[in-house]
């Protein structure tokens, strides 16, 4: 009898799990999700409040090799457009102890938060690492990009779209990054 009850319970739990509502994936034109998270200084990042002031680029990312190579382009995007009112918020999946060293070596200038449980990915309806969501002033999703491009193409395209939202001149993000790169000297 116990085996029948356990078997029935397992069958029902699998059935309910399979029919549970998945988080809906966002599309361009959708309202941005309700999103709040504390940054690494303990200050609340509230997407709705930020989007009232101007466009916000939310980047859900990690410190993997591809994301790491792409990071300078997003830092350049942040620097290029912050005076235009565009905010960049990066949410990293790393735990505190691993991230502290990473943040120090990368000299991050954008606002960032940590979410090792990846709740932010669920809120934005994605499992892709990294994922970027450009939210226009007022809170509508203006652009979405998923995946990584260490050449900076994703950051440049998002930067161009963000510039268009605030009617600003486009900045050549790649040129900014190339200008800041230190020359590599061969070892003897």
Summary of predicted features, one role per range:
Residues 89, 104-138:
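Short, internal strand/loop/helix patches
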Residues 68-106, 119-122:
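Structural microenvironment flanking redox-active thiols in thiol-disulfide oxidoreductases
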